UniProtKB/Swiss-Prot annotation:
Enzyme class: oxidoreductase
Pathway annotation: Porphyrin-containing compound metabolism; protoporphyrin-IX biosynthesis; 5-aminolevulinate from L-glutamyl-tRNA(Glu): step 1/2
Gene3D superfamilies for the chain: Glutamyl-tRNA reductase, N-terminal domain, NAD(P)-binding Rossmann-like Domain
Positions that bind substrate: T49, C50, N51, R52, S109, E114, P115, Q116, Q120
Entry GO MF terms: glutamyl-tRNA reductase activity; NADP binding
Entry superkingdom: Bacteria
CDD domains: NAD_bind_Glutamyl_tRNA_reduct
NCBIfam families to which the protein is assigned, alphabetical: hemA
The protein's name: Glutamyl-tRNA reductase
GO terms for biological process, alphabetical: protoporphyrinogen IX biosynthetic process from glutamate
Amino acid sequence: MTLLALGINHKTAPVALRERVTFSPETLDKALESLLAQPMVQGGVVLSTCNRTELYLSVEEQDNLQEALIRWLCNYHGLNEEDLRKSLYWHQDNDAVSHLMRVASGLDSLVLGEPQILGQVKKAFADSSRGHLNVSELERMFQKSFSVAKRVRTETDIGASAVSVAFAACTLARQIFESLSSVTVLLVGAGETIELVARHLREHHVRKMVIANRTRERAQALAEEVGAEVIALSDIDERLKEADIIISSTASPLPIIGKGMVERALKARRNQPMLLVDIAVPRDVEPEVGKLANAYLYSVDDLQNIIQHNLAQRKAAAVQAESIVEQETSEFMAWLRAQSASETIREYRSQSEQVREELTAKALAALEQGGDAQEIMQDLARKLTNRLIHAPTKSLQQAARDGDDERLHILRNSLGLE
């Protein structure tokens, strides 16, 4: 039995290829059934995200194994083999285990240390567990990767610092305001970055969120998800005074929030401070706003400085995380080797018990026929000894004839003679 990890990711393949190799949730079961129908595949898990598609497999070793699996993947997706080979990576046993642990821990992610990948790996495992896993070693490998990812999060600072604009904006807000549960946040825009910001804020139980967007329909879906109110951009002037935090990210060519607008809001707030985070390019907030007392304006460049500092911290933490992965990989491979030995031990024990049962049955039959008990017991002990040491004796003799001192030493050691 061999453990494999093969696939493509954001480092090896462009998005044009990655989107062609993806497995949708609707087709995953059929894909796994097709994969397990391959004679060499014993069990499998498919991990498919926007940044990677990977197969984790337990397989029987055979000639042309790599070619057979690449051919299956290409046939399933209608790909040219040469196009895929250029971007495909292939990890086996120790390297496959290490790769999965690194993936689950966020060490192989586009954003170093991002936590979302662990949830994606867990979902891939759960989806594949519906009748497609089949192999205890593969299951144990995934369970181990989950515990390693948790250990990396607990023992290192890899996830402690913001390394995305959205996360950095929320981190900044949490640093300035002691608790977000008492603040009102105005989000301007409804694009991807604002979506991420809104979800981060929801996780930190912000008191109230208001989303201002040019098109109400786009903002409405996000508002329903995070429990926010939707207003038009034209309403910002009137509603700005309610906001403790303003985070803006639109595609507007001109500023949406001007100095005069903020001055009026501050006056209505009796100069209670406002945090304005402008992550738009071009800028949504006039730079002059930053000169106002009690208006704290941060631009996307300010956030990038925070991100770069935090990324350096994550890279330092990643060194410690890699050591954890290396240690845990070694422990898992030791367990895997022990599992292989366990099967041999079971076979050897079963064989010995068959010999014992056979000779004991003969001895009991002899006793029933009135034979001398002492002679029968001595005969049983002699025959049992001879049968049990027959195979090791032959191996010792053969090693001696071959002049194989190393093998002779191993045999003597295994028999407890050294």
